[in-house]
């Protein structure tokens, strides 16, 4: 085995271990924020939506800057610094009793993510061969789902005692992750050249097809991020207990672990990537529409199952499409910019969704936010269809098995 192949194989295992620590640290805390501050402390959902939207926008919206800096200085210092900054954000969240302090903690958490997320994604592009990326992204997503349910279970258990324990656990996990990277991550360059920050950003912005695709995905993310805000609140409202939220993540884990990799393997040989993305988005949109009209957990969990199945179909294709055009001279910049749709869609959906949720309750129309999300999903579906049919996408982005 050549040294390059050996480095790639070792890199895969490193990425998987690192990803598990990050996912556990995140999901111990974030799914419970809405339960803690809306249900336990009585805050308006829009206040928590602003906090979650701020974290999303800072982390993903500034990702191109974090990626460009990592292209210039390498992955390791950015990742370690970002992990420690997120740990500080979680520690601050544990003592938040006013909205401004929650917002500040989410700002710190998002800024940390800005530093570590783009270089971690760029390492995947660097270490995983193009023909293997779809399957590797599926493995990462299976791991995400398992880590999400384990993290949510642990966080729900700790929440019975004290929210500060929840935040302390998340902070400790990110400190461990920082130490893991500081100890074992080689000083790898992300790009084939030490690209200046401005040059990396220029290369991304000149790729109009990629920019259009990323911005169109904002509508997709408006649906996807509600697993952190309105879905947990809805489950808690119907069940009458925050303990039921863990079953929502258990459903996601079961579906992902049993279906994600087989569906990815089966569909990559039969359908183009853009068809898989659009099919998954359509299922997600259809499942969102009736959520506000359900009256029991069985109906709600059935719709959540359908939503997760749509995500299982769409996510590997979306990740592969986002990684395919990355210029080897500016990998960090490309992967940072690829998160901009999540920044825009997530921020709008968290703040707007929280506001619509409060308004729906006030007007006795709980279906209002869910109908709006379903409509946004359909508009995004049509926009992606127009883009893929009118703007010729490179064959390597579309071919089965690309």
Swiss-Prot record:
GO cellular component, one term: plasma membrane
InterPro entries per the UniProt record, alphabetical: MFS, MFS_dom, MFS_trans_sf, MFS_Transporters, Multidrug-R_MdtH
Subcellular location: Cell inner membrane
Alphabetical UniProt keywords: Cell inner membrane, Cell membrane, Membrane, Transmembrane, Transmembrane helix, Transport
One GO MF term: transmembrane transporter activity
Membrane topology per record: Multi-pass membrane protein
Periplasmic side: 34-98, 160-164, 235-243, 298-299, 361-367
Record's keyword annotation contains rRNA-binding: no
Domain of life of the source: Bacteria
Key word Nucleus present: no
Cytoplasmic side: 1-12, 117-138, 186-213, 265-276, 321-339, 389-402
Membrane-crossing segments per the record: 13-33, 99-116, 139-159, 165-185, 214-234, 244-264, 277-297, 300-320, 340-360, 368-388
Pfam families cross-referenced by the UniProt entry: MFS_1
Cited HAMAP family: MFS_MdtH
Family (UniProt): Belongs to the major facilitator superfamily. DHA1 family. MdtH (TC 2.A.1.2.21) subfamily.
UniProt protein name: Multidrug resistance protein MdtH
Source organism of the structure: Salmonella typhi
């Amino acid at each position: 085995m050549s040294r390059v192949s050996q480095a790639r194989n070792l890199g895969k295992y490193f990425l998987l271990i690192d990803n598990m620590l990050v996912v556990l640290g995140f999901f111990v805390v974030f799914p419970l924020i809405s339960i803690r501050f809306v249900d336990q402390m009585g805050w308006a959902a829009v206040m928590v939506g602003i906090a979650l939207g701020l974290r999303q926008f800072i982390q993903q919206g500034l990702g191109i800057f974090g990626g460009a800096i990592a292209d210039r200085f390498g992955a390791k210092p950015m990742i370690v610094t970002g992990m420690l900054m997120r740990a500080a954000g979680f520690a601050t969240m544990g003592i938040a009793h006013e909205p401004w302090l929650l917002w500040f903690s989410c700002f710190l958490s998002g800024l940390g993510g800005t530093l570590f997320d783009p270089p971690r994604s760029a390492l995947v592009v660097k270490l995983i061969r193009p023909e293997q990326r779809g399957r590797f992204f599926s493995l990462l997503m299976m791991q995400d789902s398992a880590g999400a349910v384990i993290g949510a279970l642990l966080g729900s258990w700790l929440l019975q005692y004290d929210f500060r324990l929840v935040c302390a656990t998340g902070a400790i996990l990110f400190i461990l992750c920082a130490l893991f990277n500081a100890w074992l991550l080689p000083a790898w360059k992300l790009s084939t050249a030490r690209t200046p920050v401005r040059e990396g950003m220029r290369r991304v912005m000149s790729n109009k097809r990629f920019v259009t695709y990323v911005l169109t995905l904002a509508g997709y993310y408006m649906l996807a991020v509600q697993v952190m805000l309105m879905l947990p609140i809805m489950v808690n409202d119907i069940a009458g207990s925050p303990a039921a939220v863990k079953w929502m993540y258990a459903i996601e884990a079961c579906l992902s672990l049993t279906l994600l990799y087989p569906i990815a393997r089966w569909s990559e040989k039969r359908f183009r990537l853009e068809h898989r993305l659009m099919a998954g988005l359509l299922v997600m949109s259809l499942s969102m529409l009736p959520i506000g009209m359900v009256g029991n957990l069985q109906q709600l969990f059935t719709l959540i199952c359908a939503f997760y199945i749509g995500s299982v179909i769409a996510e590997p294709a979306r990740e592969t499409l986002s990684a395919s055009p990355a210029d080897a001279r500016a990998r960090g910049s490309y992967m940072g910019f690829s998160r901009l749709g999540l920044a825009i869609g997530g921020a709008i959906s968290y703040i707007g969704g929280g506001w619509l949720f409060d308004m729906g309750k006030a007007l006795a129309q709980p279906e209002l936010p869910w109908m709006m999300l379903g409509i946004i999903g359909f508009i995004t579906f049509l926009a992606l269809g127009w883009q893929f049919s009118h703007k010729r996408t490179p064959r390597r982005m579309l071919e089965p098995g690309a």
